[in-house]
Curated annotation (Swiss-Prot):
Belongs to the papillomaviridae E2 protein family. This is Regulatory protein E2. Residues 209-282 are annotated as: Disordered. Keywords: Activator, DNA replication, DNA-binding, Early protein, Host nucleus, Phosphoprotein, Repressor, Transcription, Transcription regulation. GO terms for cellular component: host cell nucleus. Transmembrane segments: none annotated. It comes from Human papillomavirus type 55. One of its GO terms (molecular function) is nucleotide binding. Phosphorylated. Its main location: host cell. The keyword Iron does not apply. It comes from the Viruses. Binds DNA as homodimer. Interacts with protein E1; this interaction greatly increases E1 DNA-binding activity. Interacts with protein L1; this interaction enhances E2-dependent replication and transcription activation. Interacts with protein L2; this interaction inhibits E2 transcriptional activity but not DNA replication function E2. Interacts with protein E7; this interaction inhibits E7 oncogenic activity. Interacts with host TAF1; this interaction modulates E2-dependent transcriptional regulation. Interacts with host BRD4; this interaction mediates E2 transcriptional activation function.
């Protein structure tokens, strides 16, 4: 047991040094996965010997350490092939080479420089989902890596490799999941892309509302594939009425019918829907600031293994700067699919917490929030 504990301490110390170094060198990240692989081997052997704890660390079940070890081997071998490619000398962060990123859509590819894309389903501002469009995607093709660029159109997020367009997010499938109709709007920065269903619905509404002399006119709408930098719904003329909502009050000008329809740019303002309402969730009135009997806490968030190593180091080197540290935990009722775990630290008072934050250097992959715990600790 002492031999395993000694080797485990050395392994976790190396992991902490790699986290704190936050290198952009791919060889460092290969070393990181080698350490995780070795750690899993030690924990697997300890469990086979009947050990449930090594120091303060709980020894996981055999299947857990075995599965995580296999994942570490996969990541190590994949990164080694990437190192030998044309892109091995590019800057790579620890987040770029994490397993979470590896399994993020598009799966089994490395990604860089993501941009948030908002999709509004059913033209409802309260039904918005966020996705990530990647600028660069590294695809493994047989025996080599290929670097391609990501694109966006009304159908979804995709990349082109070998003349084949591969969608890794399909907005129509997402609309069936999150919406009640096959209508959606894609917002990228200041540009808006609309689904064909949204455009046809808009054309029909405007034609009915127009004068009788224009109902038989032909309607032309052009939809272009878009890049994040340019508006993508264009046409010969522009119409002010919004595509998804009817005016709430009577219109004063009935002589402005148009023969063609375009989807409005996100910078345009609809005068009939320009009211601003206060956000009741942001109101601080009546807030109870009576924290005099509450316990100051810091909640750490990050990779479970990183948090375990950090907690071990805190107990070893900074145990006078906090009172207690929880085990790693997660919210069980959360709707998110985040793999991050949490660790809660408690303090005697705010001064001790402030001293902790000013003294302890947290790894770049760990974030924190400060707060209070109203329950008394036993």
């Amino acid at each position: 047991m002492e031999t395993i504990a000694k080797h485990l301490d050395v392994c976790q110390e190396q992991l902490l040094e790699l986290y704190e170094e936050n290198s952009n060198n791919l060889t460092k990240h290969i070393q990181h996965w080698k350490c995780i692989r070795y750690e899993c081997v030690l924990l697997h052997k300890a469990k086979q010997m009947g050990l449930n704890h090594i120091g303060m660390q709980v020894v996981p079940a055999l299947t857990v350490s075995q599965t995580k070890g296999h994942q570490a081997i996969e990541m190590q071998m994949t990164l080694e092939t990437l190192l030998n490619s044309d892109y091995g000398m590019e800057p790579w962060t620890l987040q770029d080479t994490s397993r979470e990123m590896w399994l993020t859509a598009p799966k089994y590819c490395f990604k860089k420089q993501g941009q948030t894309v908002e999709v509004k389903y059913d033209c409802n501002a309260d039904n918005i989902m966020e996705y990530v469009s990647w600028k660069y995607i590294y695809v493994h093709d047989t025996d080599k890596w290929v670097k391609v660029t990501g694109h966006i159109d009304y159908k979804g997020l995709y990349y082109v490799h070998g003349g084949h367009k591969t969608y890794y997010t399909n907005f129509e499938k997402e609309a069936k999941k999150y919406g009640n109709s096959l209508q959606w709007e894609v917002c990228i920065g200041s540009s808006v892309i609309c689904s064909p269903a949204s455009i046809s619905s808009t054309v029909q509404d405007v034609s009915i509302a127009g004068p009788a002399s224009h109902t038989s006119s032909s309607t032309t709408t052009t939809l272009a594939q878009a890049s994040p930098a340019l508006p993508t719904c264009t046409s010969e003329e522009r119409v002010d009425p919004p595509p998804c909502k009817r005016p709430r009050g009577p219109t004063t000008n009935t002589n402005n019918a148009r023969d063609t329809v375009s989807v409005r740019h996100s910078d345009s303002v609809d005068s009939t829907n320009n009211n601003i309402y206060p956000n009741s969730y942001n109101s601080n009135k009546g807030r109870d600031n009576n924290f005099c009997t509450a316990t100051p806490v810091v909640q750490l968030q990050g990779d479970p293994n990183c948090l375990k190593c950090l907690r071990y180091r805190l107990h070893a080197k900074h145990k006078t700067l906090f009172v207690a540290a929880s085990s790693t935990w997660r919210w069980t009722c959360s709707d998110t699919s985040s793999k991050h775990a949490l660790v809660t630290l408690t303090y005697v008072n705010e001064e001790q917490r402030e001293q902790f934050l000013n003294t302890v250097r947290l790894p770049p992959t760990v974030t924190y929030k400060v707060g209070y715990m109203s329950l008394q600790l036993l």
